[in-house]
């Protein structure tokens, strides 16, 4: 499995809140039964690398379907093939090291 961090930022003009669009993205992810986690600066999704690339395109398009004219999207994909990785593994590893020190 791979991990993708995605930040979809609809350019909403005068207003600054994009939470309504972020909520739509999370409704879509839930409907697709994808492991995902919202954090303050974006969303992390777990899946196969090829599926994550296709998903990124779909998530990028969602605000356009709501009438937004400009969307800025940032994608990071960690495609590790030497061992299985899951959502939360990196955080657990750091927390373990913090307990040791």
Residues covered by each model-derived region:
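Charge-rich, low-complexity N-terminal segments
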Residues: 1-101
